Amino acid sequence: MNLKLVFESGDPVLIGVFVLMLLMSIVTWCLVVLRCIKLYRARKGNAAVKRHMRDNLSLNEAVEKVRAVDAPLSKLAQEALQFYRNYRRNEASELAQALPLNEYLVIQIRNSMAQIMRRFDYGMTALASIGATAPFIGLFGTVWGIYHALINIGQSGQMSIAAVAGPIGEALVATAAGLFVAIPAVLAYNFLNRGTKILTQDLDAMAHDLHVRLLNQKDS
């Protein structure tokens, strides 16, 4: 099963399958590395934000301390406090009179959480698509390769096991390549999806804490 023979055969379809597999593998590993780095930094930053939020009784002081931290929880805390201040500054407006502070904060904090999580969704669709389609693309390459191998064998008239095993063995490499690309993509998708869920849980907990503290805030 020599890949060199596959490319030397000159079959454009089979060559295209292997080139596509190579590109999909490169995309997969680039996404895995970038997403893991981003997830690690987010968790590290979130841990620092949690410490500051616990150590400071004043929400204003806590938010000021976490302002320099690049983390989802920091962004959520800053935006939530800004929503509160905007509401207090415009209490005479029609919106403030029609919408209580409690409901206003719930709506705005939820919107903020959704925007923050969108930053961590990129690449997940690509990983899922690669994991789902790579085995079938590899299988297509195998079927195509076996079909042409049998045609060539029939035309040459050589029906020995050696004549059949070589070309068919080369075609089967496409299926192995599809699995080689798909398995890391599926494992990475599951791992990153779990990391994103943990991040969402952290945001939910922080949102609840911010909501309660802002409703009891006396000094904006």
UniProtKB/Swiss-Prot annotation:
Keywords: Cell inner membrane, Cell membrane, Membrane, Protein transport, Transmembrane, Transmembrane helix, Transport. Disulfide bonds: none annotated. The accessory proteins ExbB and ExbD seem to form a complex with TonB. The lineage of its organism: Bacteria, Pseudomonadati, Pseudomonadota, Betaproteobacteria, Neisseriales. InterPro entries: ExbB/TolQ_transport, MotA_ExbB_proton_chnl. The gene is exbB. It holds the Pfam family MotA_ExbB. The keyword Acyltransferase does not apply. It is a multi-pass membrane protein. This is Biopolymer transport protein ExbB. Involved in the TonB-dependent energy-dependent transport of various receptor-bound substrates. Protects ExbD from proteolytic degradation and functionally stabilizes TonB. It comes from the Bacteria. Belongs to the ExbB/TolQ family. GO terms for biological process: protein import. The chain crosses the membrane at residues 13-33, 126-146, 168-188. GO terms for cellular component: plasma membrane.
